[in-house]
Amino acid sequence: MFGFEINAHCANTSARCGTFETPHGPVNTPRFMPVGTLATVKGISTEQLGRTGAQMVLSNTYHLHLQPGEEIVAAAGGLHRFMGWNGPMLTDSGGFQVFSLGDLNKIDDRGVVFRNPRDGRTIDMTPEHATQIQMALGADVAMAFDQCPPYPATENDVIDACRRTHAWLERCVTAHTREDQALFGIVQGGCFPHLRRESAMAVASFDLPGTAVGGVSVGEPAEEMHRIVRDVTPLLPSHKPRYLMGIGTLREMAIAVANGIDLFDCVLPTRLGRHGTVLVGGERWNLRNARFRHDHTPLDPSCSCVACTGHTRAYLHHLIRSEELLGLTLLSIHNITQLVRFTSAMAQAIRDGCFSEDFAPWEPDSPAHHTW
């Protein structure tokens, strides 16, 4: 039901392209996954989302538990039917949101008690509860409940977070009984190399269908994130998919793929789109800028999305300046398409044997400016 086949390797880096098989179809890697936190990618219908080339979509356990509730989703036949998406799906455990968004009352080895920001009621979230919610939601991949330490954090605090994360993973494995759903573990460890290595080996020992690197993109310098990926990835099973959580910029994805990462997710493309910013040729353009007012050329002539094939820069500029909802939708569609295209281009470069030539300029030690 689940399998991962590596189709090609880069001879000069650790980059690889492969196919991750799920009950709802294959995911070609490396691949960017759009974020549909509340069973919707903001401002985009599932039909529009499918046309971006997206294959796997991420939703969030914490937010769906609060609204509408996993029982509503389960009654609809699961997350796929509830949102009308027929492709693969992944649910984050909600651990990051509990620690970053919730009003924490208590955290201990048992789990977390926090206050529901919607109605003020107390919620007791344990690894077992998070796993049960995800089984009810029914995504193809569920993530283990973990403790993501903030940045910066003391070494003792990160040690405690790692200890809990590993103990909670064991409890998630015990609680997880749904055979048509894969459970991924999450590596933590903050910016402490020895803790990252210990966490990677601990999580890898469970021999799960896949592994994620978490606790990045939480405020640490980019160089720290690069080092974490470089140090941790070789310790993860090479025959299983590796998922770098919360990363979606071109440079960071290229560097991560060069180090053997397969999957990514990030809210960046839709967040940028909602603020009038588009991704073109490796750059970010603010379409509110007056320079686009008289520009009647396509946004990106090389892009096949509806924003680029059906509209001009001047029209998109007009929509954004007029605060028309259509503008936000079109820009979000374009940005997702760009990130999916970028990961697809990396996969093709790996197959063609030119990944290191085409994407090496993204490496932090290279001064070259890369456009694609």
Curated annotation (Swiss-Prot):
Keyword Ion transport tagged? no
Could you tell me which SUPFAM superfamilies the record lists for this protein? tRNA-guanine transglycosylase
Q: Which residues bind Zn(2+)?
A: C303, C305, C308, H334
What is its pathway?
Answer: tRNA modification; tRNA-queuosine biosynthesis
Required cofactor(s): Zn(2+)
Q: List this protein's GO terms for biological process.
A: queuosine biosynthetic process; tRNA wobble guanine modification; tRNA-guanine transglycosylation
Q: Coiled-coil annotation: which residues? A: none
Q: How is the cofactor bound?
A: Binds 1 zinc ion per subunit.
Q: What EC number(s) does this enzyme carry?
A: 2.4.2.29
Outline the segment boundaries, as ranges, of region: RNA binding.
Answer: 246-252, 270-274
Q: What does this protein do?
A: Catalyzes the base-exchange of a guanine (G) residue with the queuine precursor 7-aminomethyl-7-deazaguanine (PreQ1) at position 34 (anticodon wobble position) in tRNAs with GU(N) anticodons (tRNA-Asp, -Asn, -His and -Tyr). Catalysis occurs through a double-displacement mechanism. The nucleophile active site attacks the C1' of nucleotide 34 to detach the guanine base from the RNA, forming a covalent enzyme-RNA intermediate. The proton acceptor active site deprotonates the incoming PreQ1, allowing a nucleophilic attack on the C1' of the ribose to form the product.
Family statement drawn from the similarity comment of this UniProt entry: Belongs to the queuine tRNA-ribosyltransferase family.
State the protein's name. Answer: Queuine tRNA-ribosyltransferase
Q: Supply the source organism for this entry.
A: Synechococcus sp. (strain CC9605)
